[in-house]
């Protein structure tokens, strides 16, 4: 439970069975990791999701990033880095510098752990910021929340995007007519 809620306090804790089962499952995934074929061969292809960070259980979007032609290998932005899986795939494909961003400190800690485990810390920089870092990149990836509804728990923020706010912010930041929103070169 320390992974999910931090160090234990002196008082007891009450939680639902659903939440407890989620904690147990998240702990198992974090301990064992998940094989990601786009990261190469075992055992050096595992991502270790943390509680509250979206787990890359569906690999279609990961494989798309692994297989798509790269416009450049100098720099890429990974918006909403989560576990760091897309940053890791890009770095393993030869992108020299990947900047991963997220607002959630738990996601950034998870991504940092995964990037270090994979030996990619010299290629991937992680920044706590809302959407885009400063500057421009020839490649920008993002796996945004896809359901336009309100999240009722922290883990759901990776799935639910109230009023499509993240998606709209991401699209607006790609090319904003020469202003601060021009992040894609």
Task: State what each model feature region is.
Residues 1-35:
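N-terminal auxiliary segments of SAM/dcSAM-dependent transferases
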């Amino acid at each position: 439970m320390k992974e999910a809620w931090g160090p234990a306090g002196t008082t007891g804790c009450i939680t639902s069975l659903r939440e407890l089962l989620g904690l147990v499952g998240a702990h198992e995934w974090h301990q064992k990791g998940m094989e990601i074929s786009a990261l190469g061969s075992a055992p050096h292809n595992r991502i270790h999701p943390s509680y509250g960070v979206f787990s890359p259980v569906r690999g279609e979007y990961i494989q798309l990033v692994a297989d798509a032609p790269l416009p450049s290998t100098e720099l890429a932005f990974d918006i909403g880095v989560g576990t760091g899986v897309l940053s890791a795939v890009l770095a393993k494909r030869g992108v020299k510098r990947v900047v991963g961003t997220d607002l959630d400190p738990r996601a950034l800690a998870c991504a940092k752990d995964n990037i270090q485990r994979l030996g990619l810390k010299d290629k991937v920089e992680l920044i706590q910021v809302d959407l885009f870092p400063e500057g421009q990149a020839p490649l920008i990836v993002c796996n945004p929340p896809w359901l336009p509804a309100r999240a009722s728990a922290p883990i759901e923020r990776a799935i639910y995007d109230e009023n499509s706010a993240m998606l709209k912010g991401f699209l607006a930041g790609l090319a904003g007519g020469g202003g601060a929103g021009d992040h894609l070169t």
